[in-house]
Amino acid sequence: MTTTLQQRSGASSWQAFCEWVTSTNNRLYVGWFGVLMIPTLLAATICFVIAFVAAPPVDIDGIREPVAGSLIYGNNIISGAVVPSSNAIGLHFYPIWEAASLDEWLYNGGPFQLVVFHFLIGIYAYMGREWELSYRLGMRPWICVAYSAPVAAASAVFLVYPFGQGSFSDAMPLGISGTFNYMLVFQAEHNILMHPFHMLGVAGVFGGSLFSAMHGSLVTSSLVRETTESESQNYGYKFGQEEETYNIVAAHGYFGRLIFQYASFNNSRSLHFFLAAWPVVGIWFTALGVSTMAFNLNGFNFNQSILDGQGRVLNTWADVLNRAGLGMEVMHERNAHNFPLDLAAAESTPVALQAPAIG
């Protein structure tokens, strides 16, 4: 009889836990994806903070030239970063127990893998948690679809790109200047500015910002007056009210006359779908572009493609980008034995577009 009571008690405890996890009455929804998300994001955050502050230098290139990224080794918030794991590790999974000692693990950049893998699992779980909460509330699932754009971008720079290049040392460092360094090297090695998917991403991000500002300013300018001049117009809205808080007809008429009639949406639902879809699709394409360039399917190369009647090169913007890329690549590869192949195997190229007159 005692055993039966204990089993029922255990079953009821598990049932209570399940109900708490899936309850939409909690102040913050947990969900089954949250059970995975919370510990992984906590682990990634704690390790990132400790490594950013106190991690020793990392032999990122695998040539016994450690690079310091933490604050206590002389960096500041701008220059500091969690340095990617060593090129000597390559694509090997490198948890703490794979190293001979903790010092070796730190020297080879083990914290980077710990942070990145837990972070990726955490954001995947966060996306699943968005779907789960939408499902519990009977909503459509498009919130997690929109969030898939930054998830795809993070996966591209932290996972797909290292896979394509053959080493986690080529992943994006976890810091401000490290991000810019990654962007410069990416341009030097893959000519991303001349890749159409990157162009679509730029149109998505900047276009999304423009459309967001246009929509917000139009709505704010066509609010239905519910307050006096001495009150804030925000007091004219009551949460959950049935009537529209702004006049979409007035906004449509204004914008239709400012541009032309069919440039303005007359359907609020299609408008907001467009506002969501534009940046999401753009960022999807950027992530896809990085993922293809990871395997060296690079941007267009129009270098020295325009010649005059005598066969001399007429330098274009493509040539400027190419020469800038060569300079960035030389700075990136700091060692003679690791010199960029496209410089070492080709004829010398003048750096300046026009040599200055001397004397």
UniProtKB/Swiss-Prot annotation:
EC number(s) stated in the UniProt entry for this protein: 1.10.3.9
Protein's UniProt name: Photosystem II protein D1 1
Residues the entry annotates as binding Fe cation: H215, H272
Lineage of producing organism: Bacteria, Bacillati, Cyanobacteriota, Cyanophyceae, Synechococcales
Cofactor, how bound (note): The D1/D2 heterodimer binds P680, chlorophylls that are the primary electron donor of PSII, and subsequent electron acceptors. It shares a non-heme iron and each subunit binds pheophytin, quinone, additional chlorophylls, carotenoids and lipids. D1 provides most of the ligands for the Mn4-Ca-O5 cluster of the oxygen-evolving complex (OEC). There is also a Cl(-1) ion associated with D1 and D2, which is required for oxygen evolution. The PSII complex binds additional chlorophylls, carotenoids and specific lipids.
Family: Belongs to the reaction center PufL/M/PsbA/D family.
GO MF entries: chlorophyll binding; electron transporter, transferring electrons within the cyclic electron transport pathway of photosynthesis activity; iron ion binding; oxidoreductase activity, acting on diphenols and related substances as donors, oxygen as acceptor; oxygen evolving activity
Amino-acid positions noted as binding [CaMn4O5] cluster in the UniProt annotation, renumbered to this chain: D170, E189, H332, E333, D342, A344
